[in-house]
């Protein structure tokens, strides 16, 4: 379940910061060991981590908060939650973040942001359909197994009743035969 919009913006900003921080941390570890002098690899790597990871995480947080803000605003204005909102939010975010570079770069970034989020939404929709089909298949299998189990149970109960009836009739016959022998 998604959080309400104000909370969603904060959650997405924090999540984006964490993703950016970790990604840049991994990149800086690789770069630190590759570019550093052999006797100062660890110090150089940690210096890169302290310097660049928070900045990169902050950039991701800005992107995440802008994206969530636009997504929530579009949801409020359009009164719907569909795939158009995130795609438009991605385009708006890309355009706003590239606005300082001029119109040409802003339009290119907006197109890239919209296309990128559109690809993510298409993949998410495809995975959701696949999971839904698997869920329906599992439900159908469960219903078939349950039906088979119920049929087997009824069959066993029928067999038990027959055995009980046969056993009672044999006892009755034996009792009658025993009474006849006494006479």
Swiss-Prot record:
The chain crosses the membrane at residues 13-33, 57-77, 107-127. It is found in: Mitochondrion inner membrane. GO terms for biological process: protein import into mitochondrial matrix. It comes from the Eukaryota. Residues 131-141 have a biased composition (Polar residues). Keywords: Membrane, Mitochondrion, Mitochondrion inner membrane, Protein transport, Translocation, Transmembrane, Transmembrane helix, Transport. Residues 174-183 have a biased composition (Low complexity). It is a multi-pass membrane protein. Signal peptide: none annotated. One of its GO terms (cellular component) is TIM23 mitochondrial import inner membrane translocase complex. The keyword DNA-binding does not apply. It holds the Pfam family Tim17. May be involved in the translocation of transit peptide-containing proteins across the mitochondrial inner membrane. Belongs to the Tim17/Tim22/Tim23 family. This is Mitochondrial import inner membrane translocase subunit tim17. It comes from Dictyostelium discoideum (Social amoeba).
């Amino acid at each position: 379940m998604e959080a309400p919009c104000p909370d969603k913006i904060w959650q997405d900003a924090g999540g984006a910061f964490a993703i950016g921080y970790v990604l840049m941390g991994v990149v800086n570890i690789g770069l630190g060991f590759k570019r550093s002098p052999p006797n100062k690899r660890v110090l150089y790597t940690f210096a890169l981590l302290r310097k660049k990871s928070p900045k990169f995480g902050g950039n991701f947080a800005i992107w995440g908060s802008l994206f969530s803000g636009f997504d929530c605003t579009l949801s409020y204005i359009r009164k719907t939650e569909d795939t158009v909102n995130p795609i438009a939010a991605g385009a708006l975010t890309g355009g706003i973040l590239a606005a300082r570079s001029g119109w040409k770069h802003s339009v290119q970034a907006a197109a890239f942001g919209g296309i990128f989020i559109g690809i993510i939404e298409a993949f998410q929709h495809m995975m959701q359909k696949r999971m839904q089909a698997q869920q329906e298949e599992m439900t159908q299998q469960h219903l078939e197994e349950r039906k088979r189990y119920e049929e087997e149970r009824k069959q066993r109960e029928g067999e038990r009743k027959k055995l009980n009836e046969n056993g009672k009739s044999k006892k009755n016959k034996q009792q009658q035969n025993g009474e006849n022998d006494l006479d």
